[in-house]
Design a protein with these regions (language model features):
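Conserved catalytic or regulatory cores that recognize and/or transform ribose-phosphate-containing ligands
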Residues: 1-145
Length: 145
């Protein structure tokens, strides 16, 4: 199964977490497209946009990291783009709770677009990789919706 790993990538801590998670998932037999490691030859907004959009199109599933007080805007767009095409797995290891009671930890458009939700407050990157792998194996067919 080919996964597009969406998530914030603007700090060294975020990039390091993403890289560790991708390596662990690959060790579990998952092919991972990690945007931060797929730099286009031309480093401009259009090239990055096209590269990431194409990465989503070539993947079977989008796994989106939803940590932080509010999910990353680029990650939210990637989920919206993928929604009508393929399953989405939302992952949150952040113990901070956003949202309102009964509406989920973030915007309802994200909450309701997900095929699988993984909530693992305080989880290590190893625990997170295992939970994502379990979720991916529970998705019977990665065919478009």
């Amino acid at each position: 199964m080919k996964v597009y790993l969406a998530g914030p990538l603007f700090s060294s801590a975020e990039r390091s977490w993403n890289e560790k998670l991708a390596v662990l998932l690959e060790g579990l037999g998952v092919e991972v497209f990690l945007p931060q490691t797929q730099e286009p030859q031309e480093r401009n907004a259009r090239a990055v946009f096209q590269k990431d959009r194409d990465g989503i199109d070539r993947s079977d599933v989008v796994v989106a990291i939803m940590d932080g007080p509010d999910p990353d805007s680029g990650t939210c767009w990637e989920c919206g783009y993928a929604y009508g095409k393929k399953p989405i797995v939302l992952v949150r290891t952040d113990f901070r709770r956003g949202g309102r009671p009964g509406l989920g930890p973030y915007n309802a458009m994200l909450t309701e677009s997900a095929t699988v939700h993984i909530e693992l407050p305080f989880a290590s990157v190893e625990e997170t990789a295992t939970a994502i792998h379990r979720a991916l194996t529970s998705i019977k067919s990665p065919a478009p919706r």
